[in-house]
Amino acid sequence: YVNHLFATAKNIAELNMGATTVAAGFLHDSIEDTSVTPEQIEKEFGEEVLFLVEGVTKLGKIRYQGTARYNESLRKLFVAMSQDIRVLIIKLCDRLHNMQTLDAVPREKQLRIAKETLEIYAPIAYRLGIKKLQRDLEDLAFSYVHPKEYAEIKKILKNKKEVIENHLNDFQKNLKKNLLKNGITKFKIDYRVKSLYSLYKKIQKYKGDVESIYDISAIRVTVPEIGDCYRVLGIVHGEWRPLPERIKDYIASPKLNGYRSIHTTIFTGDGAIIEVQIRTEEMHKEAEHGIYA
């Protein structure tokens, strides 16, 4: 029980939420599962922590009962969100630890909890723009709901890993050299590989044609200011040929969940096609941890 509370609080802290939310995360089950009273919480931790703990308690247990009850589950979550977004973030972090320890429960319960996670909790994390949480919830649930497909996607990524990393490392060096040559000195370059569930959905969309998916991996360039993003885009397009239909400016037109970045896909010249994502440090923080962090 205490391990679960620590883990939930840790998950919240990793999203860069404040001390009040972390404290409420540690206490989120206390009213329901212990003899601790609301008055004791308020006396020791203050009115705000109590408000959050009671919010999580009122939200209660959202149980997966098939698609017919899906909208009702979402309604409860959005009511909680309208009262204080932190209540929902605590609930999502609570669910993340439940998923991380799901191997300890019977198969039937595993399947129910994993379906809840995939169909209710992960989409909420997406709507809040908390990419890290969405990714973790989806991949954990995917392994229980579709174990065969999960194993297949892992195998695809494993087989492509070495080739992908070689292309990324070569391109990274060339990109760094070109940015410095053009006067961009403050930047960070890293890369991400598509999450397992995200790749699974993409493969379904392309009817199994993995070779038509150009964003299995992507280079990320992080710069200080918005103007720098467009300067980097100009340098990239000046050096490498872009695929015109794959240039997306989510800075000028953010996604509905608030996501901002520039995406472009280029031919590297050595037979590879690579997606490049360009954003500011603030945008990257928001993309990973949500705009509420």
PLM segments and residue spans:
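Hydrophobic or amphipathic alpha-helical targeting/insertion segments
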Residues: 28-55, 130
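Conserved catalytic core of nucleotide polymerization and phosphodiester-bond processing enzymes
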Residues: 17
